[in-house]
């Protein structure tokens, strides 16, 4: 099975694999069986959203199952997709597909009009973490990566943790209040306590170092697989300061990290503007400096944005770079993908990507 987080591809090999991208294909697995093929169901359309920053989702609509004489859907079809059912989704062309999502049926509904459709919404494990209720826990471990493993162990039916270990040497228990998702995203990621990303792809839940540079999943050419491109970068010139305190040593620490756009710009303010953060867990100089660096890296990525539209390619996923080549000097670079939207309907398959940083 392909490793979507590390494998690289050539356009020619993908065209060969997918029969020149002519006939989109979808497989929806329940208990290892492609339910579309097994039940001979007609898929009207499907959209899959994969993201670094929010729960992944998929919505698909099934047609030709409403029976007007009996005024009901065909017997047993809706029951196959009852909420809570675990689902895997694969996209591709012809008989060649690639699994890109594992989740659970979050919502089941219907649409009646020109077409009478059963509508299924699938969410990945992060949605379950959001709605699983608040927790009040003291995590008595040495590293933030250990906290992540502990939290994710409750969700083993939906995912397997893939963890880049941290070396935090925590001196005191870490308090969690709120949902598992909010704790990981707000406390561990956004506040820079660990220089890690948390996201889900397929059956894996990643807690990994942010790649500042990595091989691109694909080199894309405009007019070939790349259909549209928008990119921009904004003015950025600041210093991040993280202030911590060690109660045992009765010592305070300040970690500093300057971040400035790597693109051409004129400096406007002297001295450099300072943005200060307080972190009680930054109980030594190394931790304070590391957290300042993590916040600065995030600010740098957020200052570089854009959007790509490509032919449908399931290999394009968040957490990877796509390299644009042979277009224009300003835009010929590697773009970090933060969100992907795959859409299939009839004979079309389009992949749209949001950019969150580039190299």
Question: Language-model segments: which ranges?
Answer:
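An acidic/polar, Gly/Ser/Thr-rich interaction patch typically located in mid-to-C-terminal regions
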Residues: 48-80, 225-359
């Amino acid at each position: 099975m392909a490793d979507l987080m590390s494998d690289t591809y050539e356009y020619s090999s993908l065209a060969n694999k997918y029969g020149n991208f002519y006939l989109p294909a979808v497989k929806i697995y329940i208990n290892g069986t492609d339910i579309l093929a097994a039940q001979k169901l007609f898929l009207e359309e499907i959209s899959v959203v994969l993201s670094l920053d929010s729960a992944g989702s998929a919505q698909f609509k099934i047609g030709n199952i409403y029976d007007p004489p009996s005024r009901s859907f065909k017997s047993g079809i809706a029951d196959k997709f009852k909420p809570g059912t675990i689902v895997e989704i694969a996209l591709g062309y012809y008989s060649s597909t690639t699994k890109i999502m594992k989740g659970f049926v979050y919502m089941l509904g219907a649409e009646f009009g020109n077409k009478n459709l059963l509508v299924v919404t699938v969410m990945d494990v992060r949605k379950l973490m959001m709605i699983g209720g608040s927790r009040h826990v003291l995590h008595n471990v040495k590293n933030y990566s250990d906290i992540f493993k502990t939290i994710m162990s409750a969700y083993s039916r939906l995912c397997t943790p893939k963890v880049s270990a941290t070396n935090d040497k925590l001196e005191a228990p870490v308090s969690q209040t709120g949902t598992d998702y909010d704790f990981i995203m707000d406390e561990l990621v956004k506040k820079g306590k660990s220089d890690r990303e948390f996201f889900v792809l397929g059956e894996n839940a990643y807690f990994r170092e942010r790649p500042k540079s990595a091989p691109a999943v694909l080199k894309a050419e405009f007019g070939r697989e790349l259909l549209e491109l928008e990119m921009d970068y904004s003015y950025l010139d600041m210093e991040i300061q993280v202030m911590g305190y060690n109660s045992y040593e009765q010592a305070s620490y300040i970690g500093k990290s300057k971040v400035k756009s790597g693109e051409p710009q004129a400096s406007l303010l002297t001295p450099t503007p300072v943005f200060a953060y307080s972190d009680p867990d930054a109980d030594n100089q190394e931790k304070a400096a590391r957290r300042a660096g993590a916040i600065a890296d995030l600010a740098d990525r957020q200052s570089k944005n854009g959007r790509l539209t490509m032919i449908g390619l399931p290999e394009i996923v968040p957490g990877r770079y796509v390299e644009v080549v042979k277009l224009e000097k300003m835009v010929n670079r590697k773009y970090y993908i933060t969100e992907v939207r795959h859409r299939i309907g009839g004979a079309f398959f389009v992949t749209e990507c949001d950019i969150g940083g580039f190299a």
